Regions:
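Active-site loop architecture of trypsin-fold serine endopeptidases
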Residues: 69-72, 76-77, 102-104, 138, ...
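Terminal peptide-recognition signature
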Residues: 57-63, 83, 90, 94, ...
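A conserved glycine-rich beta-strand in the N-terminal activation segment of trypsin-fold
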Residues: 9, 40-50, 66-89, 106, ...
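Conserved active-site neighborhood of the chymotrypsin/trypsin-like protease fold
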Residues: 38, 87-167, 322-326, 331, ...
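Gly/Ser-rich catalytic serine loop of serine hydrolases
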Residues: 4, 79-83, 141-145, 198-214, ...
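C-terminal recognition in membrane/secretory proteostasis and scaffolding
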Residues: 1-33, 50, 118, 132, ...
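N-terminal activation segment of mature serine protease catalytic domains
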Residues: 22-73, 82, 88-91, 104, ...
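Short, conserved beta-turn/loop elements at beta-strand boundaries and strand-helix junctions
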Residues: 67, 88, 103, 122-126, ...
Length: 364
């Protein structure tokens, strides 16, 4: 009996000794693990520094240089906005409202270089303009034509707000395909409010106009253009800014460089999406009618001359389905003025095909 008790006591003492020996090591390893994890998190902060460094050198400040009658003809330099270097040849994309009616333009780069710039072309409808500088070794913004902006994407707005110096603000893509806004021309031409904007909550202030909206890889997403400042009840909305998508911006830029202006086809209608049609407004018993409802026809315009009427439902344009107002009007803009196209419409219960000769969009 005493022998058994003695053996149990010895075994207990050995186990206790082992536990006492390894417990400090266990405590040390646990502490090391948590400390290592903490250090690792602190060593790798979330940052867009590399992306900004990739894009920011291509974002320039746009100034006007004017002689002052009040200061004996001395030259005054005034900030107009921002711009983006799009080509090594010196083409800079900015907003039309930034450089409109300015006689002398000066472009200032991030590296301190300053150049005079000349206007290549402007487009009021998209609020875009191309200016050119004669310079070498220019930083050019990165463009990825295969990448599409999606709602929720993180974006960075780069510009020079209030002439404070180059500034970066961060937000997300809040919406795509925004139309209307301040660029509506109200002409009933089908172009009023047709521009396809990106909406973002990244701050876009005076001086940011014409600057770059980039993604977290430093790739150009859009050209910053305006902030929504029309609040109801006197309040000033916050976090609502807009940018022109890069695909539209580069397409317009190419036309401005080639022709000095954008030559657009014009059909002379104002349309709305054909949604919520009654069940009897169908091509057959099962398929819903898809198209664009003609809300207004410009008197003596191409559509009017071709026989289109208010209330017609546009089904196809030049052989392509009229899926949406924006897509259909984009198709029209790409048609060379003077071209006769076939237009399929539905009027009441009848479907018919008309020939419409596209004209050039009238400059306002």
């Amino acid at each position: 009996m005493l022998a058994k008790l003695f053996r149990s006591a010895i075994i207990g003492a050995i186990v206790a000794g082992i536990l006492l020996a390894i417990m400090p090591l266990l405590r040390s390893n646990t502490a090391l693990f948590f400390r290592s994890h903490s250090i690792q998190s602190e060593d790798v902060p979330l940052s867009y520094n590399q992306d900004v460094r990739r894009a920011a050198p291509a974002v320039v400040n746009v100034y006007s240089r004017e002689s002052s009658s009040e200061n004996n003809g001395e030259l005054n330099i005034r900030l107009l906005g921002s711009g983006v270097i799009m080509s090594e040849k010196g083409y800079v994309l900015t907003n039309n409202h930034v450089i409109n009616n300015i006689a002398q333009l000066v472009i200032s780069l991030q590296d301190g270089r300053v150049y005079e710039a000349c206007v290549i072309g402007t487009d009021k409808l998209t609020d875009l303009a191309v200016v050119k500088v004669e310079a070498a070794n220019l930083p050019v913004i990165t463009i990825n034509e295969k990448r599409t902006a999606h709602i929720g994407d993180v974006v960075l707005a780069i510009g020079n707000p209030y002439n404070l110096g180059q500034t970066v603000t961060q937000g997300i893509i809040s919406a795509t395909g925004r139309v209307g806004l301040s660029l509506m021309d109200g002409s009933g031409s089908g172009f009023g409010g047709r521009q396809n904007f990106l909406q973002t909550d990244a701050s876009i202030n005076h001086g940011n106009s014409g600057g770059a909206l980039v993604n977290t890889l430093g790739e150009l997403v859009g050209i910053n253009t305006l902030t929504f400042d029309k609040g109801s009840g006197g309040e000033t909305p916050e976090g609502i800014g807009f940018a022109i998508p890069v695909a539209l911006a580069t397409k317009v830029m190419g036309k401005l460089i080639r022709d000095g202006r954008v030559i657009r086809g014009y059909i002379g209608i104002n349309g709305a999406q054909a949604e919520g049609l009654s069940p009897n407004s169908t091509l057959d018993g099962n398929k819903r009618l898809q198209g664009v409802i003609v809300m207004n026809v410009e008197p003596s315009g191409p559509a009017d001359k071709g026989g289109m009427k208010k209330g017609d439902v546009l089904l196809t344009m030049n052989g392509k389905p009229a899926v949406s107002v924006i897509e259909t009007m984009d198709q029209v803009t790409e048609i060379r003025p003077g071209t006769a196209v076939l237009v399929t419409i539905r009027r009441g219960d009848q479907e018919m095909t008309l020939s419409v000769t596209i004209q050039e969009f009238p400059e306002s």
